[in-house]
Structure formats: structure tokens, C-alpha cells
Amino acid sequence: MAYNKKYADWKRKIWFTIKAPAIFNEVELGETPAYKPEQVIGRRVELNMALVTNNYQLQNYKGIFKITKVEGTTAKTELEGIKMYESIIQKWVEPGRDKITDSFVIKDKDNRLVRVKPVLITNRRLHRKQGTAIRNIWRNYFVELGKKLSFEDMVMKILNKEIPEQLKIQIKKIYPPLFFAIRQFYLEPREKHILLIE
């Protein structure tokens, strides 16, 4: 049989098992091949949170995990963020309704930068002052929450709907939402030039 360099090189690769962080019980996220352990560091994997947690109620979100350490053939990860599937949000968008989005950065209690992207949909167009008031509600809420909780703690409270439910109570005072969610929540690289909300 003719020598196939590509096949021979592939056979020399090692398969590393990717594990979730401790907050998700270090469940297996998949596998990734590499020649050396250091080649695995920095790789990312995105996976539906229902598969990560074995909880189908979290199927609207995907988690982003980054490999930060390798022990033997086990690649350990840290959570970089969660993102809601855009199709979930689009189901609520109809003519005559209003969609309010926002994007801002806060600090968590460990001084890490966190990007927060809420989305709100109402059954009619809101006045500009109402939109501004609603944005102020969730911005102030997350600034104060970040002083008390870590990024991971806030992620868990988003997934279990504690944070969205608390915010909906406050938002209703301005206008009742048809749909409200934290569509994206992730760690922001410090090297980027950003405007921090404090």
C-alpha cells in the first residue's frame, strides 16, 4: 500500500477528553485531537446547555467553554459565556411589537469584565423615555449584582431564571414585557477598548 503521509500524521495525534468546569460537575463535553497537550490550550467548544446539564429546560442556551489546562489526556475548561439561540428571540418578533436590546460591560466581584446583552419585546412601540428607563433598570441591577457575585454565580442565576424573573418585576412598573431574556452573557477580554458601566 502506498505511504499516505496525511493518514500517518493523523494516527500520531492524541485524543483529549474535554471536561466542563466544576460548576457543571466536570461532565464530558467531547474530544479534540492534537499532537501535543499545549496545542489544545485555548481551543473552544460550544454546546447546548441542555446537554451539559442534562436539563432540557436550558435548551434555549448554548455554553462557550475554553480549554485552559491539560492533565494527561484530560482537557479542562473554563466557562466563557452563554448565548441564547437567535431563533428563540425571533419567534417573538412581529409587526407592531417593539424590540429593545442593549449591550454593556460590568465588573463581577472578582474584577473580571462581563458583557451583558438583554433583550425585551413588548406588544406595542414604547416611548423613548420608557426605553431609557428600562435600560437604566437592568444596567443598575447588573452593576450592583456584579459587586456581590462572580461571573459563574450570575450565569447560574440566569439559567435558573432567577435574574430574569427579578428584572421582569421591575420592568413591569414601566411596561409589561411579552418576552424578556439575557440573550448573551460572557467574559470580555481586557485587551479590548470598552466602555465600562459603573
UniProtKB/Swiss-Prot annotation:
Pfam families this protein is in?
Ribosomal_S3Ae
**Entry's InterPro entries?**
Ribosomal_eS1 (IPR001593), Ribosomal_eS1_arc (IPR030838)
Membrane-spanning regions, if any?
none
Its GO biological process annotations read:
translation
Q: Which UniProt keywords apply?
A: Ribonucleoprotein, Ribosomal protein
A GO CC term assigned to this protein in UniProt? ribosome
Any one Gene Ontology MF annotation carried by this entry is: structural constituent of ribosome
Q: Is the keyword NAD in the record?
A: no
Q: Which HAMAP family match?
A: Ribosomal_eS1
Which NCBIfam families does the entry link to? Answer: PRK04057.1
The UniProt family comment states:
Belongs to the eukaryotic ribosomal protein eS1 family.
Tell me what this protein is called: Small ribosomal subunit protein eS1
Taxonomy, top ranks, is: Archaea, Nanobdellota, Candidatus Nanoarchaeia, Nanoarchaeales, Nanoarchaeaceae
